[in-house]
């Protein structure tokens, strides 16, 4: 069990709400491989409705969700176009290569996580050249986690879709935190995904479920994705006990988990505003905190490890972001305004301990 009182390492650390736990205990179940589980069916129907797609598929994880989409879209030897450092490339154990047998062309992105659509078009391979792989898919991530979880607006997603479709390939949206994007932009998720041929979203991040993601797309796409899920060992039996929290999370209004994401965004901004004024904290523009991620650096990056160790001793968890370039804090269900105040006080004490700031004046 974590010793952390305030765990800001990720929104994956969330615990299910009491109502989710009750829903799990009382879930009506059946054999989902035989398509007999009514709770899973209800979740998939709700997900399809919210995303504006024909059908949906419950999967154990976001990694599996993205992978089954790649397996459907990309033939062996095909190539995927994505942004440098995108999640499927950098954080999913190279499954696009190991399982799908695909390669990936990586394009630079701007500060908001946007690839240039003209660059996407230029990245397409010449299909008549037998020396080259076949361009098979464009993938985009929304929110864009490496860029302070910036939400990408519908117009940009549609422009990427045009570039993909003009080249004769589909667009997949890795929407692990697509509901954060929708709340930040005040647009329906269906509008964000209108131009996408497939998408995934995660239930176990900001939506606070204990497990699971959902793949959405056309009915034919989901039929093929179901087969890919089976190949990966993702077909489960009485899995309504895991799908039930997802139905709670996707409810409309305050009884669900989507609307309350605005609280996480507000807490992230409070944290950023407080950190930005502290000596020793650099590379943080609070205006760029639009969802639930806060990235920052120390004026002496070599002190990153003792800083994080000091916070852990204070009961506060943050993350040395992969690549060792920044520190990350993520707000989520279970983190309240008072926790942000306590975190800021802990940061002040630790900065003083490691010599980056004067000792705080006792209250």
Name the predicted role of every residue range.
Residues 1-298, 305-314, 319-335, 340-363:
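Conserved PLP-enzyme active-site core in the AAT-like
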């Amino acid at each position: 069990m974590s010793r952390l009182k305030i765990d800001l390492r990720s929104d994956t650390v969330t615990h299910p709400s009491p109502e989710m736990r009750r829903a799990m205990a009382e879930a009506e179940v059946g054999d989902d491989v035989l398509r007999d589980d009514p709770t899973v069916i209800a979740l998939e129907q709700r997900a399809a409705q919210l995303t504006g797609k024909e059908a949906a598929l419950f999967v154990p994880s976001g990694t599996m969700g993205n992978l089954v989409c790649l397996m459907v879209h990309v033939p062996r030897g095909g190539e995927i176009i994505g942004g440098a450092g995108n999640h499927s490339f950098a954080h999913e154990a190279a499954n696009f290569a190991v399982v799908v047998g695909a390669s990936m062309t990586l394009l630079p992105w701007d500060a908001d996580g946007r690839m240039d659509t003209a660059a996407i078009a230029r990245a397409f391979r010449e299909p008549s050249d037998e020396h080259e792989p076949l361009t098979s898919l464009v993938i985009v991530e929304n929110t864009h986690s490496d860029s302070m979880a910036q939400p990408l607006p519908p117009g940009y997603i549609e422009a990427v879709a045009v570039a993909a479709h003009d080249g004769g390939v589909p667009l997949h949206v890795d929407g692990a935190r697509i509901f954060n994007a929708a709340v930040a932009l005040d647009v329906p998720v269906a509008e964000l995904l209108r131009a996408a041929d497939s998408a995934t979203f995660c239930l176990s991040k900001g939506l606070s479920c204990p497990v699971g993601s959902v793949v959405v797309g056309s009915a034919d796409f989901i039929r093929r994705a179901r087969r890919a899920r089976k190949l990966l060992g993702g077909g489960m039996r009485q899995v309504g006990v895991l799908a039930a929290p997802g139905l709670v999370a996707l409810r409309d209004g305050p009884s669900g988990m989507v609307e309350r994401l605005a609280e996480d965004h507000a807490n992230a901004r409070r944290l950023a505003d407080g950190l930005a004024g502290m000596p020793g904290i650099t590379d943080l523009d609070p205006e760029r905190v639009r969802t639930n991620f806060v990235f920052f650096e120390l004026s002496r990056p070599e002190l990153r490890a003792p800083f994080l160790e000091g916070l852990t001793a204070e009961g506060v968890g943050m993350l040395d972001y992969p690549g060792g370039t920044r520190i990350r804090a993520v707000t989520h269900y279970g983190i309240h305004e008072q926790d942000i105040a306590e975190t800021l006080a802990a940061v002040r004490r630790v900065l003083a301990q490691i010599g980056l700031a004067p000792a705080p004046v006792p209250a």
